Every structure is written in C-alpha cells, then in structure tokens.
Regions:
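Catalytic cores of nucleotide-sugar-dependent glycosyltransferases that transfer UDP/GDP/TDP-activated
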Residues: 1-221
Length: 221
C-alpha cells in the first residue's frame, strides 16, 4: 500500500484520488452496517472524510430498514479542511445530480464533502463553544458561515475532555508519586522522574505537555 493517508508524505499535496477514496469509504461504511444487520441509533461522522455519510443516509439509504430511525451527527474539528473536489466527481458519488446545488453539495462550483455533512446531519458538533460561535462569522467561517448560521440551533461546541476518575494524579497508580492541590510534593518527584527517563539536560525549567499540531492556530507562537 501507499504511504500517507490524505497526502504525499513530507508534503501538503493531496492524493489525486481522494474524492474517489472517501466516496467509497462513506458508502462502504453504510454498506457494512447494513450487511451486519446493525440498526444504529446514531452514526458519528468526523470532518470532510466522512461528510458524505449523512448525505447517503438521508437519500440513498433513507428507506432501508436498518436506517429508518438512525440519526447522524457531524463533528467539525477544523473548518479549514472541507474536501473540495471538481464537479465531475459528483458522478462518482452515485447521488442524484440535482443535489449539486448551492443549498446542498455545491460550493463555488466545486463539490464540498463537509458542506454535505453539515447540511444533511441531524446535529453538528465542534471542539468548543467558542469555536462553534467563531465558525458562524465571516472571519472564521471559511465560506460556510451562512450554512452554519442556518443550522445554529443544531450546532454545539463540546470540549475535549478526560475521565477524571481514571486520570487523577491523586489516585493514579501509573505515576511515580501521587499529588493534588493540597499536596504538591509528588508533582516534583514525577517531574524529576520524567527528566531522568528522557535524559532532559535542564533541570530547573518548566515542562509543558501538549497533544496538538505544531501550528500557530494552537497558540504556540
């Protein structure tokens, strides 16, 4: 198989067949669910790569037994990435050509997968309440602010989170020493252990851990 998932490794150049790949993926996902005779209550889609799932679910699969009561939610992690493709790729979807219009799948004469997901989903979520508000503005809406404003009553911002009953430094059995708000000594022991493990040369410096892209958007500047 090829290296890379969405684009050529070491570049920002997308694979030329991305539209075909993710059309196949979206339809294939629903086909598998149908063949397994699973009757899902909710299908959760993420970003443009699954944007056509809500479209298929509400059109080609709407009358199928296993999907009649299924709801679908589309999560937008980063509105910059929308899955724009040429008009001719509409033919690959197998969807009715009439859906290629400004209300549904068309976006400045291109096919827009994420727009389809937003329009056809029952609910839309994104990574925070603030971002949910921002993407309804011209400054951050990436051209889809009108569509998102129209769906504002179905748009929710949900923060990423953790289970504090498991990831709790006061009780966690996987760290060198436990600590909490009233007992911070264990935190220093954990820091020293981390520095020894990874051979970090500077001892008297702050250590910050972040799971994120190295991008200005994340506030790293």
């Amino acid at each position: 198989g090829r290296e890379g998932l969405y684009n050529y490794p070491g570049t920002t150049k997308d694979f030329e067949d991305n539209s075909e790949r993710f059309i196949f993926f979206a339809r294939g996902a629903l086909e598998v669910i149908e063949k397994l005779k699973v009757h899902p209550d909710v299908i959760h889609c993420n970003d443009w790569q699954t944007g056509l799932v809500p479209v298929y679910l509400k059109t080609a699969y709407a009358s199928k037994e296993g999907f009649r009561n299924t709801k679908v939610i589309q999560t937008v992690h980063n509105l910059v990435y929308q899955g724009h493709f040429g008009q001719s790729d509409m033919n690959l979807t197998g969807l009715d050509r009439s859906l290629f219009n400004w209300k549904h799948l068309e976006f400045y004469r291109k096919l827009n997968f994420l727009k389809g997901g937003i329009v056809f989903s029952d609910a839309i979520s994104t990574v925070s309440k603030t971002y949910a508000e921002e993407i309804q503005t011209a400054e951050c809406g990436e051209g889809l602010e009108g569509v998102l404003k129209e769906r504002s009553k179905d748009l929710w911002g949900i923060l990423n989170g953790i289970d504090y009953t498991i990831w709790n430094p006061e009780t966690d059995k996987c760290i060198i020493a436990n600590y909490g708000m009233k007992k911070l000594g264990g935190k220093q022991l954990c820091k020293k252990s981390l520095q020894r493990t990874y051979k970090l040369p500077e001892r008297d410096v702050p250590i910050i851990g972040m799971i994120t892209r190295l991008a200005e958007q994340k506030g790293l500047d």
